[in-house]
Amino acid sequence: MQDHLVNETKNIVEVGIDSSIEESYLAYSMSVIIGRALPDARDGLKPVHRRILYAMHELGLTSKVAYKKSARIVGDVIGKYHPHGDTAVYDALVRMAQDFSMRLELVDGQGNFGSIDGDNAAAMRYTEARMTKASEEILRDIDKDTIDFVPNYDDTLKEPDILPSRLPNLLVNGANGIAVGMATSIPPHRIDEIIDALAHVLGNPNAELDKILEFVKGPDFPTGGIIYGKAGIVEAYKTGRGRVKVRAKVHVEKTKNKEIIVLGEMPFQTNKAKLVEQISDLAREKQIEGISEVRDESDREGIRVVIELKRDAMSEIVLNHLYKLTTMETTFSIILLAIYNKEPKIFTLLELLRLFLNHRKTIIIRRTIFELEKAKARAHILEGYLIALDNIDEIVRLIKTSPSPEAAKNALIERFSLSEIQSKAILEMRLQRLTGLERDKIKEEYQNLLELIDDLNGILKSEDRLNEVVKTELLEVKEQFSSPRRTEIQESYESIDTEDLIANEPMVVSMSYKGYVKRVDLKAYERQNRGGKGKLSGSTYEDDFIENFFVANTHDILLFITNKGQLYHLKVYKIPEASRIAMGKAIVNLISLAPNEKIMATLSTKDFSDERSLAFFTKNGVVKRTNLSEFGGNRSYSGIRAIVLDEGDELVGAKVVDKNAKHLLIASYLGMFIKFPLEDVREIGRTTRGVMGIRLNENDFVVGAVVISDDSNKLLSVSENGLGKQTLAEAYREQSRGGKGVIGMKLTQKTGNLVSVISVDDENLNLMILTASAKMIRVSIKDIRETGRNASGVKLINTADKVVYVNSCPKEEEPENLETSSVQNLFE
């Protein structure tokens, strides 16, 4: 027993695990690349597709015979040629039968073969299939020694290594596949254009791509649609890689009082049902405004998805949002990767055209040799027949006097110098061939064979003659399968600028404590006299109230800065417009806020100019300034870091600082104000902390800040019980940054603590005051008395509610005077 174990141990070879894994993975990779995922550059088929078509050919399932069960076909494929799962084989067969997947179907399916809505095909035991005329052309001449056959997986049968493919299947139907470390994505094309290009290359071997582009306009998807921009097409055809934008084809129908958008053609590989659901969700969530209903009216006549618009909706704006937010516009990546000589390679369009032509030449040469040998063999026999017919009496005598067939055969060979094949054919010839009519047929057949042999020899000897045959067969295929172009191609990509379609009007943007945001036309709010009761500005959920509002133009950029120091930006028009009493939309649907992250400041700006900066203020008195240009870019949804906060601190506000600014003023909850030079806070990067702006007493914290450009600037302070006053900036003496400040407003039990301080240089502005119960009142600022810094102010609103925010806004009569500088910032 021990000796046996020793002998077994001697047969063990130790190898490094890294080298073993490397070799095994390489073998697996090549197996996937060559044997599964990528098509051959010549016939455009992956192994599974080639085996399916060959199995159908062996079953005799031509386009003119009765259908056979798909299960029978799949069984033959996996049993004889493709030792993989039946589901994978059936899925491949199903795809070849789908008119929305293939530009030229290779399988004629009967039964449920799936739909563009993503519905699965029926089980293979229910469906039936046969070949189409297109797949017959791919297999044509396979029995004429045109291709090589290789052993199948168990070496019991032979299968084709490649198919003759009389039609350029790779470019006509395209291909998609993901291998190991590489992928292919070849779009389908119109067969007429591809064959015209092939004919041109055949006659002009040195043809340039520019000339080919006169024939091949671009991809032609089975689902139609519109390709925008030719640059991506040219790049793909030139280098083998490119990208094109594909849009659904739509038209707008007008009814009595509204419009409907009708979608008639889909981008390639788009699931219609999911698209309809996607549009419905976006409309329901108000991410796309103006849609009242979406319904699918598609039937056997074709696709028809109806998007019904609201009465006041503009179809151009809705379409622009649909293209940006849904799969009504997709990007198709073109990768012309295929297998040639057992190796994967990225080809240019010209290389693929030349490869197919070379393949067809090889097929035709092999077929010609096969037919030539067959014709020569037949002519040889006919020559024997003619000798026999000329000497029929003597031949009959020789046969009659011969003791055996073998002796008769030898006698004929010796007497008339015949070959063994000829003498055998004469002995097997029927007596009816001796009639005069049959003699003439033999002579005619022989003469025709001589002409055929001469013609076949001409093909083999002349390159021009060979090219002529290739071209003739290509034109026959074109005539048989010609079809109109389905995909429209626009010269350039045009995206409608939504801003150009939206009027630049002042809006009141409000946000609730729980983060519901909306915008309302400024005209919806009426001006009232000082001391008025106010008007309800919006309904809220229970335990929620409007805590933040501001005025901005629809084209302005809103900067949202959160308590965690994160900054987000969004165009005003992207905030859903609502009625004055509506609750609005959750801000988390517009920007990506983290848990417990709350917006503390919202600013309005026209652009991200480097001539301005942002000043940030924290609850514990830290101030920081960063150039505005550092916050531009496309990270509007995920946000960008604006300030680094100390532990336990949080951001309470921010300000836009322009070149005219001279001082910063910070105000605290207990009424302390500090004014210091702007130069004391130099500009620093985004991911920094800042410096101390005000030193706070116990239980005190920052509630607001103002940027001062001149000592004549007026500041308006408002307490939580609704008292307010105007004070000149010069009333607050300049101090060094980091001090405790001076009393800015006399606070008593009647006034309550300080809520906010804002700049109000324009007396023609109105003051908007917001209470915790969502009441809002507009008061003319010129009606608010100017007092000293140590005064308490006058009553601005008669209500038992606590004031939570205040802001200035343009008067309703002069909305055109709205400027970025008039839009103030709000702080808690």
Swiss-Prot record:
This enzyme's EC code(s): 5.6.2.2
Name of the protein in its database record: DNA gyrase subunit A
Subcellular location, record wording: Cytoplasm
Main location: cytoplasm
Note: Few gyrases are as efficient as E.coli at forming negative supercoils. Not all organisms have 2 type II topoisomerases; in organisms with a single type II topoisomerase this enzyme also has to decatenate newly replicated chromosomes.
InterPro entries associated with the record: GyrA (IPR005743), GyrA/parC_rep (IPR006691), Gyrase/topoIV_suA_C (IPR035516), Topo_IIA-like_dom_sf (IPR013760), Topo_IIA_A/C_ab (IPR013758), Topo_IIA_A_a_sf (IPR013757), Topo_IIA_dom_A (IPR002205), Type_II_DNA_Topoisomerases (IPR050220)
Domain of life the protein comes from: Bacteria
Keyword Isomerase: yes
Protein encoded by which gene: gyrA
Organism: Helicobacter pylori (strain J99 / ATCC 700824)
Example GO molecular function: DNA negative supercoiling activity
The UniProt record lists the keyword ATP-binding: yes
Entry-linked PANTHER family: DNA GYRASE SUBUNIT A, CHLOROPLASTIC_MITOCHONDRIAL, DNA GYRASE/TOPOISOMERASE SUBUNIT A
